[in-house]
């Protein structure tokens, strides 16, 4: 089994082109995602992305290492199954939204908000990062810039961030 060019990494064509001749066979991929034992204070609930969409013929198998939290892992495992079933047409955002909806149909909008803000493992020894809080990143950047450069608050950005915080709680 091969985890990629690091213990926690995405898998793409160039890494498989490198390792397959060394193995003298197609790699069996053990993807260390959404496992979070290296960042136990984080949940990895965001979209599954970063792996090549053109690698199905360059590997012998693909398995995902889930988090120690079985129920929380279901969002990512749903998307990993979607990805491995049809790589060429895989869309991470669509798959993620379907996973959230199918796993919690009565309250999908709340789970989506929670998951959108719980997707990055944070700084870690594996240097593996994920996007988090994507929808409010421009507002957060504007707030930070205004404060750092002018010691002021960008009121529009503040309102956007405050609204997202209200959704969270």
Regions found by a protein language model. Name each.
Residues 85, 89-169:
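C-terminal functional modules
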Residues 1-88:
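Catalytic-core regions of glycoside hydrolase
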């Amino acid at each position: 089994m091969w985890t990629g060019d690091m213990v926690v990494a995405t898998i793409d064509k160039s890494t498989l082109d490198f390792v397959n001749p060394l193995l003298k066979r197609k790699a069996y991929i053990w993807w260390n995602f959404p496992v979070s034992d290296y960042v136990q204070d984080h949940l990895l609930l965001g979209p599954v992305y970063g792996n090549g969409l053109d690698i199905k013929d360059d590997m012998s198998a693909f398995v995902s290492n889930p988090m120690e939290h079985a129920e929380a892992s279901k969002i990512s495992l749903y998307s990993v199954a979607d990805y491995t079933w049809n790589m060429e047409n895989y869309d991470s955002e669509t798959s993620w939204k379907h996973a959230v909806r199918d796993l919690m149909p009565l309250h999908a909008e709340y789970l989506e908000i929670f998951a959108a803000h719980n997707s990055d493992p944070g700084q870690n020894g594996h240097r593996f990062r994920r996007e988090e809080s994507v929808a409010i990143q421009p507002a957060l950047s504007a707030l930070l810039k205004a404060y750092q450069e002018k010691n002021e608050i960008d009121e529009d950005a503040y309102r956007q961030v405050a609204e997202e915080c209200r959704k969270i709680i």
